[in-house]
């Protein structure tokens, strides 16, 4: 079948959206599989290792009464290892397969560093989304695998104590996250890590003007080191 895309090649290559999103799906036939309803191995696989979360965000739909059993936690590494091992490693973009994220916080899994390092050792460019609350220096000493990430994105929920608390219901959230990010920016240059650091910020209804304050927050964090939040 033909999907009817007739864009000029040079124009496509100059557009990041086409380069990073549409072209890969066209090249590996994923769009045709989707239209025809036939099976294809996923281009992206989300890994959700979080066991709990320190925040109680107003927009989150998780069940606060649900808990994992200790046996589930103990075998979590083997479960994610199996998913990684079963990857066929086919196609031009297989290395960019995995995203660690979730409705719960990934850093609450005691094997998170091990999961990341294993994926990295198998040739995958591991990426993770986190709220950054647990990203302390003591945590990093125990979870050195964090530094094997290709990319880490921090989800921001405000720009000061009040705005952070309004969303997360955690009074310490803003101060702890900002401190952790500053310490992380100072720590990375002392290692051999190639990690890239970025942020996400959810624009809640009526808060689009807050983006300026978020930029100021990022500017403050970036002032402490040559290693910076870069996207």
Residue ranges and their predicted role:
Residues 2-152, 163-167, 175, 179, ...:
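Conserved alpha-helical substructure of the radical SAM core
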């Amino acid at each position: 079948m033909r999907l009817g895309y007739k864009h000029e090649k040079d124009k496509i290559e100059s557009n990041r959206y086409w380069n990073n999103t549409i072209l890969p799906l066209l090249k590996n036939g994923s769009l045709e599989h989707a239209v025809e309803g036939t099976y294809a191995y996923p281009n992206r696989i989300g890994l959700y290792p979080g066991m709990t979360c320190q925040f109680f965000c107003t927009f989150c739909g998780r069940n606060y009464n649900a808990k994992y059993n200790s046996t589930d936690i103990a075998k979590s590494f083997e479960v994610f290892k199996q998913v990684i091992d079963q990857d066929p490693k086919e196609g031009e973009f297989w290395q960019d397969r995995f995203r660690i994220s979730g409705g719960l916080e990934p850093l609450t899994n005691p094997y998170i560093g091990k999961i990341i390092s294993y994926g990295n050792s198998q040739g995958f460019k591991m990426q993770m989304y986190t709220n950054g609350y647990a990203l302390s220096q003591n945590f990093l000493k125990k979870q050195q695998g964090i530094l094997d990430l290709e990319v880490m994105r921090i989800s921001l929920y405000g720009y000061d104590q009040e705005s952070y608390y309004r969303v997360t219901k955690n009074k310490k959230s803003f101060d702890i996250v900002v401190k952790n990010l500053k310490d992380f920016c100072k720590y990375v240059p002392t290692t051999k890590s190639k990690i890239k650091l970025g942020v996400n910020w959810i624009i809640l209804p009526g808060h689009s003007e807050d983006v300026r304050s978020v930029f100021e927050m990022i500017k403050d964090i970036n002032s402490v080191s040559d290693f910076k939040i870069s996207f």
